[in-house]
UniProtKB/Swiss-Prot annotation:
Catalytic activity annotation: D-ribose 5-phosphate + ATP = 5-phospho-alpha-D-ribose 1-diphosphate + AMP + H(+)
The keyword Phosphoprotein is assigned to this record: no
Binding site for ATP: D34, Q35, E36, R93, Q94
Protein's UniProt name: Ribose-phosphate pyrophosphokinase
Active site: K191
Summary of subunit composition and partner proteins: Homohexamer.
InterPro entries recorded: PRib_PP_synth_CS, Pribosyltran_N, PRibTrfase_dom, PRTase-like, Rib-P_diPkinase, Rib-P_diPkinase_bac
Source organism: Mesorhizobium japonicum (strain LMG 29417 / CECT 9101 / MAFF 303099)
Lineage: Bacteria, Pseudomonadati, Pseudomonadota, Alphaproteobacteria, Hyphomicrobiales
Gene3D superfamilies noted in UniProt: 3.40.50.2020
A GO term for molecular function: ribose phosphate diphosphokinase activity
Sites where the protein binds Mg(2+) 2: D168
One of the GO BP terms on file: 5-phosphoribose 1-diphosphate biosynthetic process
UniProt cofactor(s): Mg(2+)
Length: 311
């Protein structure tokens, strides 16, 4: 087994390598003067079980091309099996046609990764579970809920006062999975999105007065949904609001927006390498998925079941 990484999340890749007790593979990913991406594998991989860790986060297209070119390089270097480990799968929010004459970009990206020569995909908290079916190869979609649950139990001494909140109807399944971990109540924020990047909170379904609310979602981008949801929960009597989000996209002015919000804390994973601005934010904290991803890689390499990681 050999683990390699592109440029999108070297910090996570190094942490995963430490968990696996193996060195990170030697590969050069650089650009020519015209910005074309060039990859050179600097060690023998013939007959090896190769894992490439690369989130397709901002700049999404550059990191996607890095991944595709790395897959091609390993295929042409006679690797026995190639697994793409994609903690954050870009284009996942384009999983269906929202209107006429529009693409299903998530399916296109899945096709590109498959055609490049990968044998298996390992990812985390896909925005829509059906994206697994976009791949014609084995695909494991891990869940960050176990990592979040451990953090919640360490943070809150009185779990009986915790309510898990889904910021919209679509995230109820994810929120329920966390709530079951410590037998917490569930609430839902019913909102209406007026235009892209903005949301209007309408009402709260569930009892939140006097409770510590945990907002659970897969992606935080502009931060508007979270901030509006926090305002609505506090207006309905919540004692505090903390958000647990898997993928911290945090584009534009999101960090400043969240820093100035009523959120007690935003907890994100390192599926996307955090910027210095994120690390310096007073109410944003990063928890690591390195052990989860490392264990999944180890079990995949040894042909063991990964199903227990979903529990």
């Amino acid at each position: 087994m050999k683990l390699f990484a592109g440029n999108s999340n070297r910090v996570l890749a190094e942490a995963v390598a430490r968990y696996l007790n193996i060195p990170l593979g030697k590969a050069t990913v650089r650009r020519f003067a015209d910005q074309e991406i060039f990859v050179e594998i600097q060690e023998n991989v013939r007959g090896e079980d190769v894992f490439i860790l690369q989130s397709t986060s901002f700049p999404t297209n550059d990191h996607l091309m890095e991944l595709l070119i790395m897959i091609d390089a390993f295929m042409r270097s006679s690797a026995k099996r190639i697994t793409a480990v994609i903690p954050y799968f870009g284009y996942a929010r384009q999983d269906r046609r929202a209107s006429g004459r529009t693409p299903i970009s998530a399916k296109l990206v899945a096709n590109m990764i498959t055609r490049a020569g990968v044998d298996r995909v390992l990812t985390l908290d896909l925005h829509a579970g059906q994206i697994q079916g976009f791949f014609d190869i084995p695909t494991d979609n891990l869940f960050s809920v176990p990592v979040m649950a451990r953090d919640v139990k360490a943070k809150y001494k009185q779990l009986g006062n915790v309510v898990v909140v889904s910021p919209d109807i679509g995230g109820v399944v994810r929120a329920r999975a966390l709530a079951k971990r410590f037998d917490a109540q569930l609430a839902i924020v019913d909102k209406r999105r007026e235009r892209p990047g903005e949301s209007e909170v309408m009402n709260i379904i569930g009892a939140v007065a006097g409770k510590d609310c945990l907002l659970i979602d897969d992606i935080v981008d502009s931060g508007g949904t979270l901030c509006n949801a926090a305002d609505a929960l506090l207006a309905n009597g919540a004692t505090s609001v903390t958000a647990y989000i898997t993928h911290g996209v945090l584009s534009g002015g999101a960090v400043a927006r969240i820093s100035g919000s009523k959120l007690q804390e935003l907890v994100i994973t390192d599926s996307i390498q955090p910027t210095q601005g994120v690390l310096d934010a007073p109410n944003i904290r990063v928890i690591s998925i390195a052990d989860l991803m490392g264990e999944a890689i180890s079990r995949t390499a040894t042909e063991e079941s990964v199903s227990s990681l979903f529990d």
